[in-house]
A protein has these predicted regions:
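Acidic/His- and Gly-rich active-site-bordering loop/insert found
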Residues: 2-103
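Short glycine/serine- and small hydrophobic-enriched flexible loop segments
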Residues: 26, 119-126, 212-219
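Buried hydrophobic positions in well-ordered alpha/beta secondary-structure cores of metabolic enzymes
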Residues: 31, 48, 66, 79-82, ...
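Short glycine-enriched loops at secondary-structure junctions
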Residues: 81-86, 92, 171-174, 181-183, ...
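A short glycine/serine-rich beta->alpha loop
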Residues: 99-108, 194-199, 240
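Acidic/histidine-rich catalytic neighborhood of metal-dependent amide-processing enzymes
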Residues: 101, 106, 110-183, 234
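Metal-dependent peptidase/peptidase-like ectodomains
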Residues: 158-212, 256, 261-263
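Acidic-enriched catalytic cores of C-N bond-cleaving enzymes acting on peptides and small amides
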Residues: 200-246, 258-263
Length: 263
């Protein structure tokens, strides 16, 4: 029998505010750079087991997965929120709050969405709800940057041909993105002879050459087709040994080019 869950859900939300805040704080202060989500993923798995989601498990990509009614089904809907953040391990995950806001590196991308998803799972478990289709709740890994969607790729490999649709909770709840945005990532390495800034002056400097290349990138006219949008970004640039040494090995830059024209 179908149930009108509206009032039940609203009552649950009202009663769960403090629990959600506690979980948000506990998760937010756990460092979780892409590829290094181990501690946060382990926390999520333990939390799920603690609320009675006994079939939750962690796969080889560090996804934490809670399957419901998925056995033998090819109509699975995936709901996911990612565990990794863009912040490297050396960034302090310091929690701060005032009268209206909470602050912590990565809290909005994507820890708060992860918490909301987990609180939804708790409601389903507590009320013994069984969906009419297969459902996977996934705390997925390696969503950010050079994580390159490793977790989601693993999910589609393991459930090949069985996933009907995927909903990922990321960013603001005020918008829905229903069209995929493709991207290409490039690492550019530049190697030259280099040498001492005085004695080898005039020889090609790898850092200068890389800077010229990046400057020329900014002069490229981007395609404009209908309402589509193409962008680029130079995310990191590194290299060099000393202020008096013309870099003779390999500085590099990582370039991201997301484009709605390329899916």
């Amino acid at each position: 029998m179908k149930r009108d869950l509206t009032q039940e859900v609203l009552s649950y939300l009202d009663a769960s505010v403090e629990d959600a805040k506690k979980l948000l704080k506990e998760l937010s202060v756990i460092s979780a750079p892409s590829h290094f989500e181990d501690e946060r993923a382990a926390f999520v798995l333990s939390w799920l087991h603690g609320i009675g989601a006994e079939s939750a498990y962690m796969d080889e990509a560090k996804n934490v997965i809670y399957p419901i009614n998925c056995e033998g089904r090819d109509d699975i809907i995936v709901f996911e929120a990612h565990t990794d953040t863009v912040f490297p391990a050396e960034v302090p995950m310091t929690w701060r709050e005032d009268e209206t806001n909470y602050y912590c590196p990565g809290i909005g991308d994507d820890t708060v969405n992860l918490v909301n998803m987990l609180m939804t799972v708790r409601y389903i478990v507590q009320n013994h709800l069984k969906p009419c289709c297969g459902v996977l709740f996934v705390a997925n890994s390696c969503e950010e940057g050079l994580g390159n969607l490793k977790g989601t790729r693993q999910l589609f490999q393991d459930f090949e041909g069985r996933i009907d649709r995927l909903v990922t909770f990321d960013g603001s709840y005020r918008s829905v993105v229903a069209r995929a945005v493709g991207s290409h990532r490039y690492r550019i390495d530049v190697a030259t002879q280099g040498g001492h800034s005085w004695g080898a002056f005039g020889k090609t400097n790898a850092i200068v050459e890389l800077a010229k290349l990046l400057t020329s990138l900014c002069d490229v006219e981007l395609p404009a087709v209908g309402k589509s949008k193409t962008t680029y970004n130079v995310g990191t640039i590194q290299g060099g040994t000393s202020v008096i040494i013309s870099w003779l090995q390999t500085p590099s830059a990582v370039i991201l080019e997301p484009s709605k024209n390329k899916v």
